[in-house]
Amino acid sequence: MVGGVAASSDDNAIGYIELLWVDETFRRQGLGRVLLATVEQNLQAAGCKRVRLETFDYQAPAFYRENGYHEFAKLNYDYAGVIEYFFIKTLSLPIGYDIPPDFSIEVAEDLAMEAIENKLHAYNVKMKPLLQEKMGVTFTFLAEENGQCIGGIFGYSTMYKIGYIESLWVAETNRHAGVGTALVDALLNALKDFGCPIVHLDTMSYQGAAFYKALGFEQFGQLTYPEIDAAEVFFVKHLVSVGERTINANK
């Protein structure tokens, strides 16, 4: 096993590249391009019209640009010395590829993908040591009323103490009553206490875009999907002032 790729698609048929790794010994032989084309072909067959991803500056922004991806946003984590690029590609043409001689592409089992994840993690740590002990540290909060769950939020800190809000839900009967705000505040306080100087998220235009703007989040990117008459909006919020970031991130 000298490389691997993993991807997923959401309810709106938007593909997402979770990871791509090729053993350093076998790079620049076309394997990365073939793995990428293979997963793009599968996403297209599943009905995806677009695929997006994020990559750090020390990883593969040049590779993705060479393969038709377009940068639509980026975040500069100055305290960690890394930049995260956000890319998108339209899957509009038949996707073909030629497998290099002596190599084969197979569907991966869970154990194989776990090994790929470990290889990618080792490479990342070698290139840029983490600012936290674990790759990801999760935070979950629930809101209850009379013993019943009426809302919840899930987020995490990843790699370089980069905060991310994964999901937020409040029961319809309890919305516009401050429950969502309280849940977001609880998560932001936990991330700040952990040492995260920044938090970001993405939400659909019909979900929480106006809500996050009202809470002081700043928009740094947007993708429009005409086929579903909606947009995916990307928000960021700084949890500490610029002068505090390096200190907090290295707690």
Can you annotate each of these PLM segments?
Residues 23-33, 56, 165-181:
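Helix-adjacent hinge/juxtasegments
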Residues 32, 36, 57-60, 77-83, ...:
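Short glycine/proline-centered loop/turn elements that form peptide/ligand docking sites
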Residues 5-51, 59:
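Ordered, small/hydrophobic-rich secondary-structure cores
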Residues 43-57, 191-205:
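Conserved GNAT acetyl-CoA-binding A-motif
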